[in-house]
Swiss-Prot record:
A Pfam family annotated for this UniProt entry: ThiC_Rad_SAM
Source species: Polaromonas sp. (strain JS666 / ATCC BAA-500)
Chain residues that bind substrate: N236, M265, Y294, H330, S350, R351, G352, D391, G392, L393, R394, E430, Y457
Pathway: Cofactor biosynthesis; thiamine diphosphate biosynthesis
GO CC, alphabetical: cytosol
Primary role: Catalyzes the synthesis of the hydroxymethylpyrimidine phosphate (HMP-P) moiety of thiamine from aminoimidazole ribotide (AIR) in a radical S-adenosyl-L-methionine (SAM)-dependent reaction.
Protein name in the entry: Phosphomethylpyrimidine synthase
Reactions catalysed according to its record: 5-amino-1-(5-phospho-beta-D-ribosyl)imidazole + S-adenosyl-L-methionine = 4-amino-2-methyl-5-(phosphooxymethyl)pyrimidine + CO + 5'-deoxyadenosine + formate + L-methionine + 3 H(+)
Length: 638
């Protein structure tokens, strides 16, 4: 086992971080009702369309810039100074303080946290400026759901409304010149034409959406997860007992949000988990999730049977005081459900699920996560940590999909959701897994019913098991479908799934696949404004605005690199063809010529029937072109 260095190379860390804005893009901010609500977007500048009208110089027609949702934080803003050793500025600090329902603690509450703090050997691993943890005042509930149910619109809710409403804000100005969006099918979702702060509040109050914003993670930019909002994507990072370092994990965090991760889960299972998580949280503008049972297991040297409620409780408090925004807790794995997995092809594949199943069998007792669930809720609402109720019995192969064990646990998760909501604690529900395409929709339908429309958060699902090395592709297919049916957040899968710990490039590949899947789901639902991005790409493609195509691509770097592999010269970026078809066979160039012919020969475009050019005029055009061909020497290529 590789030992982690007991130091952090801050120079190496700073040099790893990618800070450059995307090509042709700038970070802009839209202000809300108060100066400290500044919502970031990526604005893509587009070049003019050249309109040819005869022999003279072409007329320029401006293309307005396109604004895109941006979760990359200040890392893509060259105007914002960043000091990784100090972390990001506390964006939400003033909002938390002005509510006057939290208090700074005199010190760290968890025994393990104090032990780490007092170990001089770890001094060089710790951040130099760790913030003082906060907790709700006695008797207070500081969850966003609690505020929402009291009718309070928080700054976080307004921030989210501006963020989610962006595409709608651009819609009116573009509809005059763009194709109308294709009609979507939302499967009875309640997606409004305009997102308001009141709509955000109402969705959170109903439990149909969550705002994962721990009071001890003031650096985070508010975001929302719910099926009536844009589909979100989560990326998993974290060290293992075999490999990785703090520098690597912080770099993977920043790399993940650059490529579109809306939340990040730290699934570290190696050394110095506490310190690694602190560096990640302090430098993260997106919500951070964890699976606390992983660290609790490390505290008992990997022996599941030695876990206790006291150790788990201390771990929850430790992580909540660091600022973790949501916990995956496998409280639905009950003793009675474990035998239901006996005849499965792949048994229990969830790490957290298998840990709790082993504990239940070792003690022949009900899980302490289930029996102590009310006590867990008390901790969650004191810090505003959101539940991500884990699917510990999810299928690990399509042979096991939608079986009795999976759905038994799902109904228990619905029961636990109701308990959490009595405490005004936010909840989302985790889902599979491995599910063949024809069974995907059943998962969403059953989850919406069993869990009262709490947001669904799924790992894929993979729709086939034959794709090791390409699981990001097979799972993105399932993700696009399950997102369309109503899943609120998709957990990415990388090419290394089932094979090894993902590296930097694997993280990017997984995220690109899943951002495409999420966008496809938004399009299919008919999410207002989602098609604007597609229209902008298509218009640039038809007009051979190559630079704009690269800028608008979900991965500009790769789009440009692929183009330049065969046509590297700068003049190729204004050419009306690419290396796929060449100058003679480009369908879009030919289509432009047909359009120009129709413009110059209006008499030749009289319609004999709707959408059909009169046959005589077509024949005339053919004869003219045939004559040109013969006079040109009858050569196919000149």
């Amino acid at each position: 086992m590789a030992k982690t260095r007991l130091t952090v190379d801050t120079n190496d860390l700073a040099s790893r971080i990618t800070r450059a804005p995307f090509p042709g893009s700038a970070k802009i901010y839209i202000e809300g009702s108060r100066p400290d609500i500044r919502v970031p977007f990526r604005e893509v500048t587009l070049t003019d369309t050249m309109v040819h009208e005869g022999a003279g110089e072409p007329r320029r027609e401006a293309n307005p810039p396109l604004r895109l949702y941006d979760a990359s934080g200040v890392y893509t803003d060259p105007a914002s100074p960043i000091d990784i050793t100090r972390g990001l500025p506390p964006l939400r600090g003033a909002w938390i303080n002005e509510r006057a329902d939290t208090e700074a603690l005199p010190g760290i509450s968890s025994a393990y946290g104090r032990e780490r703090l007092n170990d001089p050997a770890l001094a060089a691993l710790r951040m130099a400026h760790a913030p003082v943890p906060r907790r709700a005042k006695a008797g207070a509930n500081v969850s966003q759901m609690h505020y929402a149910r009291k009718g309070i619109i928080t700054p976080e809710m307004e921030y989210i409304a501006v963020r989610e409403n962006l595409v709608r804000a651009q819609l009116a100005e573009r509809l005059a010149t763009e194709r109308m969006p294709k009609k979507g099918h939302s499967f009875n979702a309640s997606i409004p034409e305009q997102i308001t702060a009141e709509f955000v509040r109402d969705e959170v109050a109903r439990g149909r959406a969550v705002i994962p914003n721990n009071i001890n993670h003031p650096e985070s930019e508010p975001m929302i997860i719910g099926r009536n909002f844009l589909i979100k994507v989560n990326a998993n990072i974290g060290n293992s007992a075999v490999t990785s370092s703090i520098e690597e994990e912080v770099d993977k965090l920043v790399w993940s949000i650059r490529w579109g991760a809306d939340t990040v889960m730290d699934l570290s299972t190696g050394e110095n988990i506490h310190e690694t998580r602190e560096w990640i949280l302090r430098n993260s503008p997106v919500p951070i999730g964890t699976v606390p049972i992983y660290q609790a297991l490390e505290k008992v040297n990997g022996k599941a049977e030695d876990l206790t409620w006291e150790i788990f409780r201390d771990t929850l408090i430790e992580q909540a005081e660091q600022g973790v925004d949501y916990f995956t807790i496998h409280a639905g794995v009950r003793l009675a459900y474990v035998p239901l997995t006996a005849n499965r092809l792949t048994g229990i594949v969830s790490r957290g699920g298998s840990i709790m199943a082993k504990w239940c069998l070792s003690h022949h007792k009900e899980s302490f996560l289930y029996e102590r669930f009310d006590e867990i809720c008390e901790i969650m609402k004191a810090y505003d940590v959101c539940f991500s109720l884990g699917d510990g019995l999810r299928p690990g192969s399509i042979a096991d999909a939608n079986d009795e064990a999976q759905f038994a646990e799902l109904h228990t998760l619905g029961e636990l959701t109701q308990i959490a909501w009595k405490h005004d604690v936010q909840v989302m529900i985790e889902g599979p897994g491995h599910v063949p395409l024809q069974l995907v929709k059943e998962n969403v339908d059953k989850q919406l019913e069993a869990c009262f429309e709490a947001p669904f958060y799924t790992l894929g699902p993979l729709i086939t098991d034959i794709s090791p090395g390409y699981d990001h592709i097979s799972s993105a297919m399932g993700a696009a479908n399950i997102g369309w049916y109503g899943t609120a957040m998709l957990c990415y899968v990388t090419p290394k799934e089932h094979l090894g710990l993902p590296n930097r490039d694997d993280v990017k590949q997984g995220l690109i696949a899943y951002k495409i899947a999420a966008h496809a789901g938004d399009l299919a639902k008919g999410y207002p404004g989602a098609q604007m991005w597609d229209n902008a790409v298509s218009k640039a493609r038809f007009e051979f605005r190559w630079e704009d195509q690269f800028r608008l691509a979900i991965d500009p770097d790769t789009a440009m690199a692929y183009h330049d592999e065969t046509l590297p010269k700068e003049n190729a970026k204004v050419a009306h063809f690419c290396s796929m078809c060449g100058p003679k066979f480009c369908s879009m160039k030919i289509s432009q010529e047909v359009r120009e012919f129709a413009r110059l020969n209006p008499a030749s475009t009289t319609l004999a029937a709707p959408g059909v050019i009169a046959i005589k005029q077509i024949d005339s055009g053919f004869e003219e072109k045939a004559k040109e061909f013969r006079e040109g020497g009858s050569e196919i290529y000149s």
